[in-house]
Amino acid sequence: MGCRLLCCVVFCLLQAGPLDTAVSQTPKYLVTQMGNDKSIKCEQNLGHDTMYWYKQDSKKFLKIMFSYNNKELIINETVPNRFSPKSPDKAHLNLHINSLELGDSAVYFCASSQ
């Protein structure tokens, strides 16, 4: 077996905000092989207008990937186009990732605000 078969991409997904908030993301943890396509779902029932996706890499740098407000998507230009947010409605902002790479291993979390 080559090294490529043994490598996998690991995601740790955190629920955004304090425990009494109503922002959730699923799955909570995601372990998969490189090259796979995966989605992370984020939902809020707080009636907020804006939702966000953040990424924190192994160097502990936190960066905003996407924000979505009133049908307007703002994309961080440094995010590879393999990452694409989808918002079927105001309460959801799902993150789709194509062709996962080892460098995608990070903590991803969503948040919302008014």
UniProtKB/Swiss-Prot annotation:
Residues 1-21 form the signal peptide. It is found in: Cell membrane. Pfam families: V-set. One of its GO terms (biological process) is adaptive immune response. Glycans are attached at residue 76. One of its GO terms (cellular component) is T cell receptor complex. Its main location: membrane. Keywords: Adaptive immunity, Cell membrane, Disulfide bond, Glycoprotein, Immunity, Immunoglobulin domain, Membrane, Receptor, Signal, T cell receptor. Disulfide bonds join 42-110. Transmembrane segments: none annotated. Residues 22-114 form the Ig-like domain. V region of the variable domain of T cell receptor (TR) beta chain that participates in the antigen recognition. Alpha-beta T cell receptors are antigen specific receptors which are essential to the immune response and are present on the cell surface of T lymphocytes. Recognize peptide-major histocompatibility (MH) (pMH) complexes that are displayed by antigen presenting cells (APC), a prerequisite for efficient T cell adaptive immunity against pathogens. This is T cell receptor beta variable 3-1. The lineage of its organism: Eukaryota, Metazoa, Chordata, Craniata, Vertebrata. The gene is TRBV3-1.
